[in-house]
A protein has these predicted regions:
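N-terminal low-structure segments adjacent to metalloprotease catalytic domains
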Residues: 1-152, 391-415
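Phenylalanine-focused residue identity feature
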Residues: 35-40, 45-46, 56, 89, ...
Length: 415
């Protein structure tokens, strides 16, 4: 429990420090949309622990992969119905607009509106009913996932702990906060970022980004987050492998917060990238181990290929080349040309099945933090993989690298 409290103290002190460093520009533009980590921890920190010690909860627990898949299928069903609700609601607003502007026959519009209202009413009833079931099972799905991730972390392939030191895996499946990232326009640099509420509207996002561009000459983007290393970690709902890998990634952030590597996160963009990249490597490996244990089969490489994409199109190569061109244009002072080029590339991506809302300097600044991403321009992923090859397992590597608080110490492990 002392270890858990230590992590929580570090997270909250980091949040206080981040608030003190925050520029007035960011404070003004995000007012009313901020994600409050203090309130979130107060509401969520003790929930899981209470459930674990409740002797009357045992019959409710999820104890098999079949039960877990049923839960995840229910979550997917709710998400699909919520998307359909949004579509119907938009159609209804469009009809109201056409009626006001006299662009549609009133009687025809009323018939269509009544049909939409009936569909919405049925849909809301289904969503609310399913959410009741989901909320009853959520904590038990989380416990099942936590137990399997914990087992993977302690497996021979990872083996990160001794018999004394242990950080419990704790996660909460929910909509994750969004993140506002800003960069100068004349270079790609993660200058500042801030967590925002998950329910911020697209209109508010667009206004925020536009204000920072037009009034402050900053490149800005609001991006979704897969997870946030609060305690418990916030993990977005998705397919099983995605959840496991994201949860393991966020868990390692919590673990590293107890050591120099994690505490160096905010000292430089280099150490930020090192932390994110090593958590990606760890999360991907641990997630696969946990997945194969839960499903009792080897992973299918096509498991996450659900999007309708052009398989002939090489996304990684395209994005790497895009970043190189952008950096060249920026180095020549051609800011407007670089921004036009990025938007043109976004259109090309969309035509090949990759729908990205916006690509700008801030986009590359954020996604480039993760060394394994094609948007990155550093070699940290390759370097960390080379370091990993020198160790018997992932845990031994983490044990040594967690004491590195600067890039020079990381590079010394390559010598």
């Amino acid at each position: 429990m002392i270890i858990v409290i230590s992590i929580l103290v570090y997270l909250l002190s980091s949040a206080i420090s981040a608030n003190s460093r925050e520029s007035e520009i960011i404070k003004n533009v995000t007012q009313g949309y901020e994600f409050n980590i203090f309130n979130w921890e107060r509401e969520n920190f003790f929930d899981k622990w209470i459930s674990y010690i409740n002797p009357f909860d045992n019959h409710k627990k999820i104890k098999s992969s079949e039960q877990l898949i049923q839960y995840l299928s229910l979550v997917e069903k709710i998400n699909l119905n919520e998307n359909l609700y949004s579509k119907l609601f938009t159609e209804k607003l469009d009809l109201d607009y056409k009626i006001k502007k006299g662009k549609i026959d009133v009687n025809i519009a009323k018939i269509k509106t009544n049909e939409i209202n009936a569909e919405i009413e049925q849909l809301v009833e289904k969503i609310n009913k399913d959410k009741v079931i989901k909320n009853e099972k959520k904590i038990y799905a989380e416990q099942f996932l936590e137990e399997n991730i914990s087992s993977a972390i302690q497996s021979e392939q990872v083996n990160i702990f001794d018999n004394i030191f242990y950080v419990p895996v704790d996660l909460s499946l929910e909509k994750t906060p969004k993140l506002l990232v800003i960069s100068p326009r004349d270079k790609i640099y993660r200058q500042e970022d801030k967590l925002l509420n998950s329910n911020i509207s697209l209109e508010a996002i667009n206004n925020m980004e536009l204000t920072l561009l037009e009034e402050n000459n900053l490149s800005a983007i609001v991006v979704p987050t897969g997870g946030v290393s609060t305690y418990p970690s916030i993990v977005s709902e998705g397919d099983l492998l995605y959840i496991l890998q994201t949860a393991a990634h966020e868990w390692l952030h919590n673990y590293l917060a107890l050591f120099p590597l994690g505490r160096s996160y905010f000292t430089s963009t280099d150490m930020q990238s090192i932390n994110e990249t090593i958590c990606d490597i760890f999360g991907n490996e641990v997630g696969i181990i946990a997945y194969e244990k839960i499903m009792d089969r080897k992973i299918d490489n096509e498991i996450n290929q659900t999007k309708k994409i052009n398989k002939e199109f090489n996304f990684d190569k395209f994005m790497k080349e895009t970043r190189l061109v952008v950096e060249k244009l920026l180095s020549e002072g051609k800011i407007l040309e670089s921004e036009s080029f990025m938007d043109e590339q976004r259109v090309v991506l969309s035509s090949n099945g990759y729908d990205i809302r916006k690509i700008n300097q801030a986009y590359f600044a954020f996604y480039g933090t993760y060394g394994g991403n094609p948007e990155s321009s550093n070699n940290y992923y390759d370097n960390l993989i080379q370091i990993k090859k020198r160790y018997k397992n992932l845990g031994d590597m983490i044990h040594d690298i967690k004491y590195s608080d600067n890039i020079e110490k990381i590079y010394s492990l390559l010598e």
